[in-house]
Structures are given as C-alpha cells and as structure tokens.
Amino acid sequence: IPNIFCCPVAAEQIRRLYNTEGEIGTNIKRAAFDRSSRTRSGRLKGSGRMVTQDWGKAGDYTGISAAAFFDITVSPAAKTISVTADDNVIDYLVLERDGGKLKFRVNANSTENISVSVTVPASASLREISAGSYGKVNCKMPLKGPSVSVSVSSYGSVSADIDTPGAAKLDVSSYGKFAGSVRCSDGELRISSYGSAQAPVECRNSCKLTVGCYAKFSNDIKASDLTVEISSGASVGSTLTADALTMRIDSYAKFSGTVTVNARQAKLTVSSGGSFNGTFSGSSLEASVGSYGKIYLKGAAQVADATVRVSSGANFSAPELRVSDYDLTVSNYAKADVWCSGRLKINASTAAKVTYGGPCTVETVSDNIQRRK
C-alpha cells in the first residue's frame, strides 16, 4: 500500500484500497482521500467542468444519507459507486461508513453552484434513508427491511417505495419532499413545517398520520386502526379507509376527500377554524366541532347513529347523510343541518340554529329548530 498518509492518492489507488466487500477501513479511507482533514476554508464554487470517479464497491449497507446538494441514486443495476462532480469540488467530497450507514458530504465551510451526482449499488439490507440541506435520494428498489425509516428535511427530497413486514416511519419537515408508496404492518407518518408527502399508504394494523405547520399530505390511506391529526394551517387531501378512525383538525387546518369506516366508529374533532369537507360513509359517527370550525359531510350513505356536538360559532352540515338516530347538541351561535329517519334528539341553546330533513321524530321543538322546506 502506498504511503497514503503523506501524499494524495489517485482514484485508481483508492479503488485498490477496497476489500472484497467494498469497505474501506476508517483510518485508511480518511488518509487515502485526504478529505477529512482537507476542508475548504473559503467559499467552494463549482467550476462547471464535470468529472467522474469510480469509488469502488459499496458492499452491504443498511442506511444512506445525503446532504449539501448530493443527488444520490440507489440502483440495482450499478456495480460500483460512481461520483460525478465539478473538477474543483470532487476532491472535497467525503464518503463515511458509520455503523453500516453510508454518509455523503462535502468538506467546505460554504458552497456555491456545485453539482454532485452519485450512483450507489443497491443493498438488500437498506432500511434507512435520510436527506437534508437540498440533498436528494432516488431509490430504485423497494425498501424491504424488517423495519424502515425515512427522514427528509431542509429542502431535501426522497423518492422511494417502502414495503416492509414490520413498522415504517416517515418524517418530512422544513420544506422536505417525499414521493413513493408505503406498505407496512404499522405506520407512523409525520409531515411538518411546509414539508410535503405524496404516497399511497397501506398498513395492515395501525397508522398514525400527523400533519402540521402548513405541511401537505396527499394520496390514499388504508389501515385497520387509523389516527389522523392535522393542525396549524396544514392540509390533507386523501381517501381514508379504516375499520376505526380518529381524526382531529384544528388551527385552520383542512381535510378534503373521502372517509370510509368499515366496522367501528368514526370520531371527528374539528376546532379553531379547522375544516373537514368530504364524503363520509360508516355505521356510526361521533363528531365534535367548535370555535368556528366546520364539518361538511357529503354523500347519502346509511349511518345507524350519530352523536354530534357543535359550539362556539361552529358549523356542522350533513344534509344528505342518511342517519337513523341523531343525538345533537348545538350551542353558542353554532349551526347544524342534518337529515334523520328515526329519532332526532336535539339540545339547542337560544343562540343556536338547527335545520333538519327526513321522516324523523323530533324530541325537542323550539323556534330555532326548523324543518327544511
């Protein structure tokens, strides 16, 4: 082995340092690249003249991390790691192996107009992807580990399909983006701070979706037990299918789409200017809307029973939903518009307003309760 601790090593010599598994010893790799100690003190500006280096085999790895403008493609067709970058930038690029995770970064205090493209051979053990600081990862193979975690932040983006027999975790924040699909036993999806995710989700057991701070989620979700929390101006446009559903919407957040609850009860809570606008079908409904929140349920599905609380300037509207029995409480300048075929029990304060339709029996009658014409 050449005296790599004293002089720079050419790309061909770097390739020879790889063992049969594609791994480089940490100390040798640092010295060979002379990169960990080689840090650009001033601004590193890309020249626009692109060169490509072969960094040898990747070996088996469980995670991959992209940061600082790295554009990484995980390809089943690739045999070795291929790196393309500006000719004055490529010597400041670093690949570290940390506990089975490949970490790509650039050793510079600041950068300008750099372009780094990396192709990495796929690993069957890959189960963790992270991207931040405008980094990108495009994984062209499904992530099939026993559990899978994907994290995207700071304008990063990840494109990947998750197909695991275990748990899946997705965390997208700070203008990060995720596109792909999720299949798992139990899923936890958190989208926040202007992040966005477009992914059909199918969980055999439970799924929890949390969307906040002007973030966005779109596509279909199927789960046995589904919890959805939307807050702080966030929005969800989706078709939700579950055996049991709990949904909370507040702080001017929005949901639009379709909700189907196959077996047990759907629980909807909307407050603080939040809104639910969608088609609903299910056997039982429990809804609470307050503080100028809005629930507008479309469709004429058959519902056995519904318990609804409307307060503080809120609005509940389900004029076509075919509910057999209603238990309705409306107060403090709130409004409700419902359809009922059986028993309609109403508790309405003097400042509230209720309109109804259907061949129902109304248990409470007052001036602020009126049949629709």
Predicted regions: what they are:
Residues 4-153, 157-173, 177-212, 216-231, ...:
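Acidic (Asp/Glu) and glycine-rich low-complexity loops/linkers
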Residues 236, 276, 316:
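Short, small-residue-enriched loops and turns at beta-alpha junctions
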Residues 352:
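Short, polar loop motifs at secondary-structure junctions
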Residues 274, 293-300:
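Histidine/lysine/aspartate-rich catalytic loop segments that bind and position anionic ligands
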